[in-house]
């Protein structure tokens, strides 16, 4: 598969993106009520969710296909630059939580993506995933491989 630009970024600094940014931030705030121990975030982008989740966990791994612009420094935090799937840099049965917000709609092989997530989760581990609801949008997003 050729690499296609399918990434979206949102920022709280740009007023035109504030609604999108707030929607993303709410997901992180809700996840912060649930996560603990060792987590993986797939599609961490600019890393603005880290400040919500990092205080709640022992180990935080971030994966994104683009070079990190994360400004956080912590012994608990590891960044991996990688396309997904596969999650070949993550050991099987090693994580308590995987969080991935507004990512699956950008993944060509979504079935393999989910299989890989469950491979790296410990037994009883939890996946926290969000994706836009296609029935609640006005038009198809051109950045999405598919919508759910």
Regions found by a protein language model. Give the residues of each.
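Short catalytic/ligand-binding loop motif for oxyanion handling, primarily in non-cytosolic enzymes
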Residues: 49-50, 135-139
């Amino acid at each position: 598969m050729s690499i296609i630009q399918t990434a979206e970024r949102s920022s709280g600094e740009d007023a035109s993106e504030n609604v999108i940014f707030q929607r993303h931030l709410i997901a992180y705030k809700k996840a912060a009520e649930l996560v603990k121990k060792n987590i993986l975030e797939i599609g961490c982008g600019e890393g603005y969710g880290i400040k919500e989740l990092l205080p709640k966990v022992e180990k935080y791994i971030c994966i994104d296909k683009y070079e990190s612009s994360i400004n956080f420094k912590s012994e608990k935090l590891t960044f991996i630059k990688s396309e997904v799937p596969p999650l070949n840099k993550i050991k099987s049965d090693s994580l308590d939580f995987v969080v991935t917000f507004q990512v699956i709609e950008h993944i060509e092989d979504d079935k393999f993506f989910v299989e890989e997530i469950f491979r790296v989760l410990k037994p009883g581990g939890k996946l926290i995933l969000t994706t836009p609801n296609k029935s609640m949008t006005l038009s198809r997003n051109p950045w999405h491989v598919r919508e759910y």
